[in-house]
């Protein structure tokens, strides 16, 4: 691969991760709106139930249904469990923690990816890229006022979700050259669907008409987020694209202002600038 092609792949990987974060923001907004009424399990169940046939149609159109049988069952079960852990953990946390704060806690994920990429993938993490990730993480820490958080189950739930997401991202990188993106995306849903169905049994609340729209947004946003994230790790190393998960801060801040009238504090803008700078450093590192 020429240096120019390699740089193009890095750029595509970064853009795909940015797109994944935009899609992910739509999920967070919808879940935050649904959480006061519906259980975490029902949200995960309907998200998975709506998304699964959409992604199945994409698999049929792009690579054929036969590709599902060659995806590596052990890996896909592992990825399904990680997806369930990430979904349940983050959605539960959103019930008790403000949206932006939950996102800040979840931002430990990219740092975990960099730390895990070397032992699990054997990827070389250059000093420049490591500095970029740490700079981005420092920006996230700056946004959170010291002493503003207390140790509670919801916080541990978000942090556990971040660990699951980091391991899922690592597995995406491991399988990206072996399994097509539609197939990778498809197998993120069945395990969550089964677990959520069992958990929802006997506690079902029939959604209001407008809430069906929000559930549909969580499904479509989830499919797009998983798809773009898988593409990102296909194009570039985990240590390169991970910092671009921080760009979700921009969209979450805008959503908070547009939908809830929230005006981010100056610390958000300063920390956000550090996050963006960290992404640039990682890209060039």
Predicted regions and their residues:
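Loop-to-transmembrane-helix transition segments
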Residues: 11-19, 59-60, 64-89, 153-161, ...
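Transmembrane alpha-helices of multi-pass small-molecule transport proteins
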Residues: 12-13, 37-85, 164-168, 187-202
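Helix-helix packing/entry segments at the starts of transmembrane helices
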Residues: 46, 102-108, 175-191, 226-257, ...
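C-terminal transmembrane-helix exit sites in multi-pass transporters
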Residues: 92, 109-131, 250-270
């Amino acid at each position: 691969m020429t240096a120019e092609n390699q740089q193009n792949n890095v750029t595509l990987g970064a853009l795909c991760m940015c797109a994944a974060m935009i899609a992910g923001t739509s999920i967070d907004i919808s879940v935050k709106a649904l959480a006061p009424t519906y259980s975490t399990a029902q949200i995960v169940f309907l998200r998975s139930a709506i998304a699964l046939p959409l992604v199945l149609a994409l698999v049929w159109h792009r690579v054929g249904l036969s590709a599902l049988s060659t995806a590596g069952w052990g890996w896909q079960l592992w990825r399904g469990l990680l997806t369930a852990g990430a979904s349940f953990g983050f959605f539960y946390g959103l019930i008790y923690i403000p949206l932006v704060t939950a996102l800040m806690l979840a931002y430990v994920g990219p740092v975990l990816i960099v730390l895990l990429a070397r032992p699990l993938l054997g990827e070389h993490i250059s000093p420049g890229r490591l500095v970029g990730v740490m700079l981005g993480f420092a920006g996230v820490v700056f946004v959170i006022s010291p002493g503003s958080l207390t140790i509670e189950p919801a916080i541990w739930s978000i942090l556990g979700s971040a660990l699951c997401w980091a391991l899922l991202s690592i597995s995406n990188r491991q399988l990206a050259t072996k399994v097509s993106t539609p197939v990778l995306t498809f197998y993120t849903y069945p395990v969550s669907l089964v677990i959520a169905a069992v958990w929802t049994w006997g506690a079902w609340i029939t959604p209001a008409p407008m809430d069906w729209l929000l559930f549909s947004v969580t499904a479509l946003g989830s499919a797009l987020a998983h798809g773009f994230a898988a593409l990102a790790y296909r194009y570039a190393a985990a240590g390169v694209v991970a910092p671009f998960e921080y760009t979700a801060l921009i969209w979450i801040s805008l959503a908070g202002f547009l939908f809830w009238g929230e005006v981010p504090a100056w610390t958000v803008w300063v920390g956000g600038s550090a996050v963006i700078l960290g992404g640039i450093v990682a890209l060039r590192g």
